[in-house]
């Protein structure tokens, strides 16, 4: 019937998943620094009182410099994978979020950025997944029943994080 058949992935949305070496040691120092910032009243708390966000300049603090030691190589790897030509890049912002039980962040993207990332310092039992949404608006015009939900037919992907996990993704990808 066919001489040849193939599947071509068109406009893929890539995630780069990393498990950071010696993350428990790094996480201990990061958590201590975050707790000190929060106790000092730095950052913002949402009206519910269960969500806290640090200032966005964490890499200006010595305690957070270990982050750049693995974020920069991960970004370099992602840019290389996409075959972009670049001489240098920089991290424009870096912040910490702490969510109370049952709290979530509203669906969002990161405008005026190229790559974004999430690093997990703590993932308590029962913590929520990060949810990535299909960026193709027209993909949802018809939703047939599925034999099985796969990456190819779903309009969102739930990724359960682990401590020490770094996820890099295009900044336009809503999560």
Locate predicted features:
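A broadly conserved detector of short glycine/acidic/proline-rich loop/turn motifs that flank catalytic sites
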Residues: 22, 136, 173
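Non-heme Fe(II)/2-oxoglutarate
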Residues: 1-87, 104
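Residues at beta-strand starts and edge strands
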Residues: 12-14, 92, 113-115
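Catalytic core of non-heme Fe(II) oxygenases with the double-stranded beta-helix
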Residues: 96-168
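A short glycine-rich, His/Asp/Glu-containing loop-to-beta-strand
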Residues: 90-96
């Amino acid at each position: 019937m066919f001489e040849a058949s193939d599947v071509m992935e068109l406009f893929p949305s890539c995630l780069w998943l990393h498990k950071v070496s010696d993350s428990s040691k790094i996480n201990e120092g990061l958590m201590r620094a975050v707790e000190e910032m929060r106790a000092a009243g730095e950052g913002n708390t949402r009206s519910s009182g269960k969500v806290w966000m640090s200032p966005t300049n964490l890499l200006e603090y010595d305690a957070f410099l270990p982050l750049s030691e693995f974020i920069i190589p991960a970004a370099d790897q992602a840019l290389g994978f996409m075959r972009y030509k670049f001489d240098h890049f920089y991290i424009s912002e870096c912040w910490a979020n702490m969510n109370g039980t049952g709290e979530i962040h509203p669906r969002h993207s990161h405008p005026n950025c190229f790559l974004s990332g999430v690093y997990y310092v703590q993932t308590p039992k029962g913590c929520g997944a990060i949810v990535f949404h299909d960026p193709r608006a027209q993909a949802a015009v018809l939703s047939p029943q599925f034999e099985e939900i796969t990456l190819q037919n779903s309009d969102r992907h739930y990724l359960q994080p682990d401590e020490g996990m770094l996820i890099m993704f295009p900044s336009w990808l809503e999560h």
